[in-house]
Amino acid sequence: MRKSIILFIALLASGVCFAQSDTVRMQGSIGEVIVEGSRHHSDLRHTPLTVSIIPQTKIESRHNSSLLPTIAQQVPGLFVTSRGVMGYGVSTGAAGTMSLRGIGGSPTTGLLLTIDGVPQYMGLMGHPIADVCHSMMAESVEVLRGAGSVLYGSNAMGGVINIVTHKMKEDGVEDKIELSYGSFNTLQSAITNRFKRGKFSSSAGATYNRTDGHRANMGFEQIGGNLNLGYEFSAHWNIAANAQITHFNASNPGSLTAPIIDNDSRITRFASTLLLKNSYERTSGAINLFFNKGRHRINDGYSPEEQPLNYRFNSHDEMMGASAYQRFSLFNGNNITVGADYFHFGGKAWNRFLDNQPDKITADKAMDEIAAYCNLRQTFLQLLTLDAGIRLDHHSHAGTEWIPQMGLSVALPREMQLKAMVSKGFRFPTIKEMYMFPPQNPDLKAESIMNYELSLSQRLLDGKIYYGVNIYYINGKDMIRTLPVDGRPMNINTGKVENWGVEAMLEWNISQSWSIESNYSYLNMRYPVVAAPKHKLFAGVNFTHKRLHIASGAQYIAGLITQTSPLTEEKGFILWDASAEYNFTQRLQLFARVDNILNTKYQINAGYPMPGTTFMGGLRFRF
């Protein structure tokens, strides 16, 4: 570990260590950010919430078909598992597990993924599908660090990742084609169109990505698309509809010590929403109808010494519902939000036999969840903001939860901001945990945590420098664990959480050509879990001169547990990436990217070695 730290410091000292932090750069002023895509529309300087924002410029400069690698680099405390060049997969051997401050789980049921504020998760398993997070559809990404259950309910126990989709602000047409090719026969392609004329606007995109993978039998292929439509009835009312669809085929060769043959997945996901919004001087709100469904077909594979399986796992699931909220400002500095949510989720899972035996049903369940919430925020003299919220959430099987939240934000001299927050997070058990497979237990109750947080931030030199530090403590109970009961495995509410940590970030716009960025997180877990590193550091520099832009990032990871039985901790490692863009014309841009320049040998999923140095090059054409 000491050698890794010395090497990392050497990279910093030589000026070749580049990174991107979690704040938005706006015309040389950092930190003045409005949260646009969530139910909590506000200036971040007047809210006790800790929110990281990744803008479109950062997403595009990464040239990655998936949003998750970019998010994981730029947000302190957030970690996403990976197993190869492209694709995360599902089921056995899958990656894409997300954890924030040690909360998330495997699979990810304690961290909520949303698109334009609408939850996205598999109706039976209760977790998001990592491979639906396409970069092409994102205008920005907002990451709420810490419990967000008052506004978002179950699964927002550790935080919320909200993908804000593209919306044209001015009349015109924007078209873009991006094509790149690289190591291991990896292809990334995307085409997008954005249009606005008068009251009507639209955004559409399609993508195709594939790779052979850096190991045999680790191929991945994906096709997807999205469509957004909007219409402004008046200055106060507008309606929007959007849909996303993706299909991918993923293969898993198994770990090095336990290889698997023919472990292949065919997954199709579809999501749509219909949104009616209103906006007046003293009030604004929305009514949202949403629908999410999936079709999964999986061959669980077999080990070399076994015979092929005579069945295939099949499932179809759905998650649908409605949400409504309205914000009121009764007088200056006042903001009251009231809202309600309804979710219906479930599906059917079965094993289909190849010899025409009758299907074996493993689940055929549906459940409902209904909730109401209220959040009050009051700002006094632009100096002190008090925030308090409460949510009542009822699950048709697991019962009722009360969720409180309180916080304050204080504006100090010299543009310093002090914030304090106490919030409860929770998640209801999933249908899988209660009714599927041998560990199931229908008597499970909700997991819950309490999150205590203190933060300090400051802008210097007219906003050219921004830094922030967060200290937090998390205490949780009734975490669902699989343990032997009467000689058989069973899911029971027995686990505990006790985490504390520190997060820090720095961004400095030195000049129009140079900027430096960094973020760091330290996590101490009394009860260790996988995919939550103790140390996570990302630092760097960006350089722009005329038509040329160069960026790179070095990330140091240490204290990463890859499995708990037996307890296995990966040695500290450094990942150094670099990219360059050159604008030949206003329409044509060429780019290249190199990942893992140091050819570091490491694993994130136990038994799945990650690729060494990889290359990617391509072009972007705007017309």
For each feature predicted by the language model, list its residue ranges.
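Short, acidic, small-residue-rich periplasmic hinge/interaction motif at the N-terminus
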Residues: 20-60, 68
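Extracytoplasmic beta-strand/coil segments of soluble accessory domains associated
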Residues: 69-118
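Short acidic/polar hinge/loop motifs at secondary-structure boundaries
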Residues: 118-145
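Short strand-turn segments of transmembrane beta-barrel domains in outer membranes
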Residues: 148, 160, 164-195, 204-206, ...
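Flexible loop and strand-edge segments within Gram-negative outer membrane beta-barrel domains
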Residues: 211-218, 222, 236-319
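Surface-exposed extracellular loop regions of Gram-negative outer-membrane beta-barrel proteins
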Residues: 249-251, 295-297, 346-347, 351, ...
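Outer-membrane beta-barrel signature, preferentially recognizing the C-terminal barrel domain
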Residues: 256-279, 315, 365-367, 415-417, ...
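Gram-negative outer-membrane beta-barrel transporters
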Residues: 379-381, 471-475, 492-560, 587-589, ...
